[in-house]
């Protein structure tokens, strides 16, 4: 393919069958690490910026300020670099060093907030910066409708294109902003009425399941609150995952399937492993690989000791 800019290569990511981790089961993973910025968040970064340009909220020479746990920030940094915007990213200090360095490589500036305040603290700080900065615009990924819409227009259609004649029975996927699980669930359930969709969240912060927020090391999911973009009525259940098991599954899929994935993708694989015994024989399951494991090599216990 030929592209006029790197942004034209966002989307159309492959679906890869897992061969060894789940013997006797048909499990597919949508490889969002194949996006040019390396994660599923490239989709929403471009969509939110283009929507703001169209509405006039973001003007040439403007500044983008966003609270992010990392991957949205990297996607925004890539898009901002192409389009010529200044970008300030706000995130908890617990986010991995690799993510921060990637943002810097794209030319973004960032502001770190206390880890114990989680994403709530990052959002509060970002709102302060918007008030202090002329020409600032905040995408607000947790509530921006362009977030859900891009998954309706692109992600869902890609799944339909590949599985129209062999429908997916169960989708199991994590919740960060809520955009992709909402967009995919609401769109695909219209095509496949029997489709079941399960959200994955950290056992240590089971907010969607009705529990209390808490600190956890599964970066990218489990924000500690229910985002406006998460339409819980589209879900058929929640699967809670232990962080140690998520890291173990991330290591296993690298060594057994050759897929180097992040911790949140490991959490999805752990949730699939947990749910498979409850599913009917022959169920076709789809999960997501949100980003690459290269972003977590410095995270404690992500790599085996030897």
Give the location of each predicted region.
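PLP-dependent amino-acid enzyme catalytic core
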Residues: 1-306
């Amino acid at each position: 393919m030929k592209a006029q800019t790197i942004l034209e290569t966002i989307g159309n990511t492959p679906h890869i069958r897992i061969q060894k981790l789940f013997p006797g089961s048909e499990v597919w993973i949508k490889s969002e690490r194949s996006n040019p910025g390396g994660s599923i968040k490239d989709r929403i970064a471009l969509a939110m910026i283009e929507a703001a340009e169209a509405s006039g909220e973001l003007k040439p020479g403007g500044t983008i300020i966003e609270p992010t746990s990392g991957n949205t920030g990297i996607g925004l940094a890539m898009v901002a670099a192409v389009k010529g915007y200044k970008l300030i990213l706000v995130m908890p200090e617990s986010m991995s060093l690799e993510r921060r360095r990637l943002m810097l490589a794209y030319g973004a500036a960032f502001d770190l907030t206390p880890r114990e305040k989680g994403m709530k603290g990052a959002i509060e700080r970002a709102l302060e910066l918007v008030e202090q900065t002329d020409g600032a615009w905040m995408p607000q990924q947790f509530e921006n409708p362009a977030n859900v819409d891009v998954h309706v227009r692109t992600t869902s259609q890609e799944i339909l294109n590949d599985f129209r004649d062999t429908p997916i029975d169960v989708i199991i996927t994590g919740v960060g902003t809520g955009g992709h699980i909402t967009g995919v669930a609401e769109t695909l359930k219209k095509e496949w009425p029997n489709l079941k969709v399960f959200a994955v969240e950290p056992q240590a912060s089971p907010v969607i399941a009705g529990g209390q927020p808490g600190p956890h090391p599964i970066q990218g999911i489990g924000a500690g609150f229910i985002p406006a973009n998460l339409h819980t009525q589209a879900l058929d259940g929640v699967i809670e995952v232990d962080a140690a098991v998520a890291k173990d599954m991330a290591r296993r899929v690298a060594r057994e399937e050759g897929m180097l994935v992040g911790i949140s993708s490991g959490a999805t694989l752990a949730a699939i492993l947990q749910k498979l015994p409850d599913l009917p024989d022959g169920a076709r399951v789809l999960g997501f690989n949100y980003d690459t494991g290269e972003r977590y090599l410095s995270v404690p216990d992500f790599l085996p000791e030897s």
